[in-house]
């Protein structure tokens, strides 16, 4: 199993959104505050579901919510520094080093599981139920800026969509997905928090030394910090899977909502979400798509504009091509052992080059 990072957006959250839309539970032009009460009265309350899906909400790309849980009095100097020094030895990115030692606030995290701290972040690290609520409160507040509605890819959009799914379905999103999709489709290797079902050795490690969680190898816990501090289940990241299971989802989309003789989504809903496109970016409704400018997008140059899918930071991608009846899934752990050594997959253009071979094979 692999941490599929932002491909959670289309392999999990978007499926739930499409299902609820199929059932007439919301409209694309509805304000998100209609379904997420914490946003009522907030400037963000007028953001529409369509804005979130197109990444045109005005919200920033991400936010370091985990800093709210860190006791600032527990370390000397700044948390990050641009160069190594006596208190900052662990490199986490190019010209970025993290403080050697710090503590979490006791009101938010504990080293032992309990009724008060039930959400596991890592080995011997648990967060309470209040912190995910605090994340939503911070999104609603003026602390997180709201800018113009141009295209700006944001994980926060899908954090809010997950909250909407849970408010409408009256179920935790991971349970809703298991009930409506993963269980019936035989996707036994697709789930959040995989250590609840699988042995550690069955899960590919993500990074060698995680600076937020005990400075140990991260295996079986989501890499994304937002998802981690929400207990592993978020709309932007958190899902673990393998290529075979992911291919089932995208084959279902290629086949207009059907898989294995069972209908999961209506043809009309599949066509709407897979064909509708933003007027100001290449984005579809929740999906990424090819760019009309050759060499600029995430897909092979020969991929038709009908293709939909998504990539993930940990080194994954999945693309459904309904025009040619093709599904392409690529999974890797490119940020292992160190997250700042991940550029090769992109600079070598490996994923689009493999996809290009598929289209060349069609011609041959």
Where are these regions (language model features)?
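Short, P/G- and charge-enriched loop/turn segments at secondary-structure junctions
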Residues: 1, 273, 303-308, 315
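A short, well-structured edge-of-sheet supersecondary motif
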Residues: 1, 28, 121-136, 318-321, ...
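Short, conserved catalytic-motif segment at the N-terminal edge
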Residues: 1-4, 25-27, 136-140, 144, ...
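Short active-site loop at a secondary-structure junction
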Residues: 1-54, 144-157, 234-237
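Hydrophobic "lid"/C-terminal helical patch
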Residues: 17, 249-250, 358
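Short, surface-exposed loop or secondary-structure junction motifs
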Residues: 44-305
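Structured C-terminal helix/loop/strand segments within mature extracytoplasmic catalytic/sensor domains
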Residues: 310-364
